[in-house]
């Protein structure tokens, strides 16, 4: 007997209290810039501890690209409260610098002068640093300075028992459920880009030396008039090696098998670069992907890993633990880069994706139609009359969007039922208005501010970042919270030193061990 979305929703309704155990966490990136909005060339501030080992504040690609990390929370308000507190602590440490509250970068120095993140001399730290050197060789440093908000989301095992009752084990139910969620996310994530895309413009110099079809808004600003998120377009992420990757989202085994091929298959252009230059490591290997995290996607199945454990192996042996949504732009109008309204809508959207019917993609497990819909929305999602392809039928953005919101509404209602109040319904209602009035979308609001203020992308973004900084600094943390962050920073420095002093093998051997830790996932029984 076929298990339908209506039946799953009915079962979910009977167990709505389990939704109080939904966990969500945020990783929010942001470039450090000086008072002129130029990328900071300073080292990671000592008051933030060691980027390698601080659980609250680390760095992403560049030494200047902060990543603020929350713990997991069962409520959106406490989640954003922690993110706000971390921002406030960081601003208590930064001297003469701001966090650039835009996804597209600030003024960048010449490519060679963009500093790669440094994590100390331990083998673990050097692995992270050399991986980033490899990214510079493969994609250039400029692209790596793009920032975003990553939203981590998980449902309790007891809820997967309700939603996927026919799988044989808790691990199988969980993994099958998350992969089903990812397929639906792939189908419908164009809607997130329309509603929350906030990057329709960028600084002209970001495109230095590259061909593009962007239009000129002012002498220093490029844009597309109906774009929602140039960050998620192909502007910066053009790469022949990755473009041929078509990972399968029909089942976890096949997904991991294809990812395994990518991290073990040599790529001629990278072989030509080699792994060393002048005796220094410049990339971890010459394969299509150095490591799993190099694969660029709008959502990832995730599993926490131990030291030196490979993500593929962890997923194959223990299954999917949560999903990481990677397509959200920084909200430039919000000091924390994401609003509670956005977070609640994403919760309801992901629950809808987990519960809705999720047919398999074609035999190769990749849906070109969904990729095409996503690509057109990020570049011209607000274009009047724009049509998308829904199962071979043309449909307008407002029509399909409203139909999706109608389908998501019952899941927003379930969260309100479980948590009390009507915050989820209100979050959904705000998105309906954006479908009816495209000028209400954040991408349209950014362009309107640039035009009406007769101001460049750079000056607008710097002014916003300054104002957010002033607002956060005007609300200093309570002494005990400041002390807790400071103690975590001190402990992270001690932990980095311990790692540096405890390495028992040289870096070459460590890299060999790291590669050897990767197991072929195909014999796995996880499904």
Curated annotation (Swiss-Prot):
Catalysis performed (reactions): L-cysteine + L-glutamate + ATP = gamma-L-glutamyl-L-cysteine + ADP + phosphate + H(+)
EC number: 6.3.2.2
InterPro entries the UniProt entry points to: Gln_synth/guanido_kin_cat_dom, Glu_cys_ligase, Glut_cys_ligase
Class of this enzyme: ligase
One GO biological process term: glutathione biosynthetic process
Molecular function GO labels: ATP binding; glutamate-cysteine ligase activity; metal ion binding
Biological pathway: Sulfur metabolism; glutathione biosynthesis; glutathione from L-cysteine and L-glutamate: step 1/2
One CC-aspect GO term: cytosol
Transmembrane segments: none
UniProt KW keywords: ATP-binding, Glutathione biosynthesis, Ligase, Nucleotide-binding
NCBIfam families cross-referenced by the UniProt entry: glu_cys_ligase
Similarity annotation: Belongs to the glutamate--cysteine ligase type 1 family. Type 1 subfamily.
Protein name as it appears in the record: Glutamate--cysteine ligase
Organism: Bordetella parapertussis (strain 12822 / ATCC BAA-587 / NCTC 13253)
């Amino acid at each position: 007997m076929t298990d339908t979305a209506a039946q799953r929703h009915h079962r979910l309704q009977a167990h709505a209290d389990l939704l109080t155990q939904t966990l969500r966490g945020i990783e929010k990136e942001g470039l450090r810039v000086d008072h002129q909005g130029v990328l900071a060339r300073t080292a990671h501030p000592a008051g933030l501890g060691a980027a390698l080992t601080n659980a609250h504040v680390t760095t992403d690609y560049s030494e200047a690209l902060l990543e603020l990390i929350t713990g997991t929370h069962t409520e959106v308000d406490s989640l954003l409260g922690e993110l706000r507190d971390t921002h406030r602590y960081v601003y208590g440490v930064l001297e003469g610098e701001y966090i650039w509250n835009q996804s597209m970068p600030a003024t960048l120095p010449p490519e060679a002068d963009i500093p790669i993140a440094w994590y100390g001399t331990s083998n673990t730290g050097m692995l992270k640093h050399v991986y980033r050197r490899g990214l510079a060789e493969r994609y250039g440093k400029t692209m790596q300075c793009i920032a975003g908000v990553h939203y981590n989301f998980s449902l309790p095992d007891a809820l997967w028992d309700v939603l996927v009752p026919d799988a044989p084990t808790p691990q199988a139910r969980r993994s099958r459920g998350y992969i089903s969620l990812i397929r639906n996310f792939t189908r419908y994530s164009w809607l997130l880009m329309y509603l929350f895309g906030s990057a329709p413009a960028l600084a002209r110099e970001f495109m230095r030396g590259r061909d593009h079809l962007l239009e000129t808004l002012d002498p220093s600003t490029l844009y597309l008039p109906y774009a929602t998120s140039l960050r998620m377009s192909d502007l910066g992420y053009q790469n022949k090696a990755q473009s041929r990757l078509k990972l399968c989202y029909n089942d976890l085994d096949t997904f991991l098998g294809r990812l395994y091929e990518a991290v073990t298959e040599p790529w001629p252009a990278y072989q030509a670069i080699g792994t060393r230059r002048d005796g220094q490591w410049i990339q971890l290997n010459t394969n299509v992907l150095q490591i799993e995290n190099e694969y660029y996607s709008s959502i990832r199945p995730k599993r926490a890993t131990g030291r030196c454990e490979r993500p593929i192996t962890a997923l194959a042996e223990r299954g999917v633990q949560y999903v990481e949504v990677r397509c959200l732009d920084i909200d430039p109008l919000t000091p924390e880069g994401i609003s509670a309204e956005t977070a609640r809508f994403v919760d309801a959207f992901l629950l809808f994706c987990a519960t809705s019917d999720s047919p398999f993609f074609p035999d190769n497990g990749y849906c070109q139609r969904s990729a095409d819909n996503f690509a057109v929305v990020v570049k011209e999602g607000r274009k009047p009359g724009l049509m998308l392809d829904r199962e071979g039928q043309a449909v307008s953005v407002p029509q399909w969007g409203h139909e999706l919101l109608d389908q998501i509404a019952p899941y927003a209602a379930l969260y309100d039922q479980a948590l009390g109040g009507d915050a989820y319904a209100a979050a959904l209602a705000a998105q309906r208005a954006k479908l009816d009035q495209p000028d209400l979308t954040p991408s349209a609001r950014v362009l309107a501010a640039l035009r009406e203020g007769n101001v460049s992308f750079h000056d607008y973004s710097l002014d916003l970042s300054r104002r957010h900084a002033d607002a956060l600094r005007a609300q200093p943390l309570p002494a005990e919270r400041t002390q807790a962050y400071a103690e975590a920073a001190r402990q992270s420095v001690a932990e980095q030193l311990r790692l540096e002093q405890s390495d028992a093998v040289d870096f070459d051997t460590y890299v060999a061990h790291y590669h050897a830790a990767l197991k072929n996932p195909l014999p796995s029984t996880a499904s």
